[in-house]
Amino acid sequence: MKISILLPYKENFSPLYPGAVSLFINSMNRLSIYKNEITVYGSTNLKEKFSDNYINIELKKSFLKSQTRDYVNKFVELHNNQNTDIIEIHNRPNYIEFLNSLNTKKVLYFHNDPISMVGSKTPFERKELIRNCSKIVFNSEWSKKQFLKKLDKIFHKSEKLEVIHQSINKEKVDIKKKEKLITFVGKLNSAKGYDLFGKSILKILDKHKNWKSTVIGDEPREKLIFKHKNLKVLGFQ
């Protein structure tokens, strides 16, 4: 069983500054019974990678064509003469149509709201994804419901659509040693709800003087700044 995973363009498959998708894929690959048959493809400038089963797609800068389209085209070229059983795409539904020339099963993973993404915003686009993918995986029932909005009932029964909840390693927790601490971990942008968290946490900390909050993460593309004496923003860890 040979599996190729195409990361979102510019996603860093590196322990130095990984994206959420890279962290998820690295964790799953280490546990997979097919881990020796999996190859991850991406495009990053960072030298240190999570694993050796990674191929970096090198691109030349061009103002005349889409870097994303060029990225996917290079991936297709690498697979034209390969016998790959499954191609995995994460959070980039618009990549699927560019892969139709490859006679390979395609699995699409949604880690966020499908109707907010290029390639799955309209009912027509989502119907095409169902037609072209062997399986579409959601990380929650909510994201699956979002995907099915305005689609005929027949699509709601499709066996191609499946929910697989993300998980973490189970740790022993001593309930008696609870702290009055609220934590936010993730990208500090509105897509992840940090704008709502920030406004809410300021109200909570003002009302409950003995509570504290810790924020772990960053977001260079969107600046959402919240300040409070009991709020610590630690940045990317």
Spans of model-derived segments:
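Nucleotide-sugar donor phosphate/pyrophosphate-binding loop at the beta->alpha transition
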Residues: 70, 112-132, 170
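N-terminal strand-loop element at the rim of the active site
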Residues: 6-15, 24-67, 157-160, 219-221
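Short beta-strand->alpha-helix junction loop in the catalytic core
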Residues: 114, 142-143, 160-172, 220
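Nucleotide-activated donor-binding/catalytic signature segment of Leloir-type glycosyltransferases, i.e.
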Residues: 222-237
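Conserved donor-binding/catalytic core segment of Leloir-type glycosyltransferases
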Residues: 4-6, 137, 174-192, 196-202, ...
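A short, active-site helix/loop in glycosyltransferases that binds the activated sugar's phosphate group
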Residues: 119, 131-160, 170
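Short His-centered aromatic/hydrophobic patch
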Residues: 89-95, 110
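Glycosyltransferase donor-sugar binding loop
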Residues: 198, 211-225
